Regions:
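Active-site-proximal segments of metal-dependent phosphoesterases and phosphodiesterases across multiple
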Residues: 261-276, 280
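Active-site environment of divalent metal-dependent phosphoester hydrolases
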Residues: 36-41, 63-64, 83-88, 127, ...
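N-terminal secretory signal peptides that target proteins for export/translocation
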Residues: 1-5
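A cross-family glycoside hydrolase active-site/sugar-binding cleft signature
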Residues: 58, 240, 264-267, 291-293, ...
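Active-site metal-binding motif and surrounding structural segment of the metallo-beta-lactamase
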Residues: 52-56, 60-134, 141, 153, ...
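Bacterial N-terminal signal peptides
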Residues: 8-18
Length: 343
């Protein structure tokens, strides 16, 4: 009897140890147009810290709006730049609509998917200051009340907030966020992205559109940015945003922030597969890579199509795993950027 009791206790201890280990993982869940695939318009990604802080990055076109059931709780909304496929001037008509290469979308004007989600989730709006002000105005239009700065009484912003609020930053700035009962906070820092940040005309007021049309110019909402998020388990993920390669991938992202996981945007307008692979292999040097923003229907049954640009990039990356940002598939990473589940 004593032997059986000891055995049961040992099994319980092992189970609890496994649970504790799992509880220390960061969960990363892409939200795309077609479940289990990496598709043309896919941008949105949710990050969940072990303490429960949940962050949405670049809502874009592949959510159905603030009521998308896949979102769950969102504490912080990040936006890399104001292009329509990131700020979300359109949204999914329905999940699985259209094809992976050409998802079916409808207009998200006048407020954008980013604005809709921030308002619906009472989220912190953390992004470059001109974009934060712009999204804050969209939230004001939805809620019929001004969007103020987030209250902060200590070194960290404590989430959730009772209403959407602004945590505007400049390039290079950072904020920290924690759940009320947590002992550690998640740090989010902005980093350089070599890209423009023009906002879609459809999201502007009629007078503003007319002013711009007179000279054939566009409105830019400050510089683009990427982010480095340091989670409480030690994982440091670099979110590239749309960018060409640049020296700060080495000096700031790798050497200063010491990012060990990279989520890299592809897309021929900003970066080629060859240059993106060079950035990974020679500049950022992460332990692992997640590939997103591929501007093609990159997969079939969750596998990269052999003749896709995405597959070509993966084949050029050396010495580290590359994971596809498959919609609805949650990946879990430990503090050393090892994928321990879902990859």
């Amino acid at each position: 009897m004593k032997t059986k009791a000891v055995g049961r206790l040992l099994l319980l201890a092992l189970a609890l140890a496994g649970f504790a280990c799992g509880a220390q993982n960061v969960k990363i869940t892409p939200l795309g147009s077609h479940a289990g695939e990496l598709c043309d318009r896919d941008r949105a990604t949710i990050f969940e810290d072990p303490t429960g802080v949940r962050i949405l990055y670049d809502a874009g076109h592949t959510v159905t709006g603030g009521d998308d059931a896949r979102l769950g709780t969102i504490h912080v909304v990040l936006l890399s730049h104001a292009h329509g496929d990131h700020i979300g001037d359109r949204k999914l008509k329905a999940l699985e609509g259209g094809t992976c290469a050409a998802p079916e979308t409808v207009s998200a004007t006048p407020n954008s998917t980013t604005g809709e989600i921030a308002a619906a989730k009472n989220a912190v709006i953390m992004m470059i200051a001109p974009m934060a002000a712009f999204i804050g105005k969209k939230v004001e239009n939805i809620r019929s009340k001004p969007t103020g700065a987030c209250a902060q009484t200590g070194p960290d912003m404590v989430v959730p907030f009772p209403a959407a609020c602004l945590a505007a930053v400049q390039l290079g700035g950072a904020r920290t966020f924690k759940i009320a009962n947590a002992t550690r906070a998640v740090e989010i820092a902005t980093v350089t992205a070599a890209h423009d940040s023009t906002v879609p005309r459809e999201l502007l007021s009629e007078p503003e559109r007319k002013n711009l049309d007179a000279d054939g110019v566009s409105l830019t909402l400050g510089p683009s940015s990427g982010y480095v998020i340091q989670f409480t388990n030690g994982l440091k993920i670099y979110l590239s945003g749309d960018t060409g390669i640049h020296a700060e991938m080495k000096t700031i992202v790798s050497e200063f922030h010491k990012a060990n996981l990279a989520m890299l945007n592809l897309g021929p307008n900003a970066v080629t597969g060859l240059s993106a692979a060079y950035a990974v292999n020679e500049l950022i040097k992460p332990v692992a890579v997640i590939v997103s923003h591929v501007n093609e229907g990159a997969t079939t049954d969750g596998k990269a199509k052999p003749n896709s640009r995405t597959a070509a990039f993966i084949n050029l990356v050396k010495g580290r795993p590359v994971y596809l940002a498959l919609s609805g598939k949650t990946m879990e990473f430990d503090g050393n950027a090892k994928c321990v589940a879902g990859c």
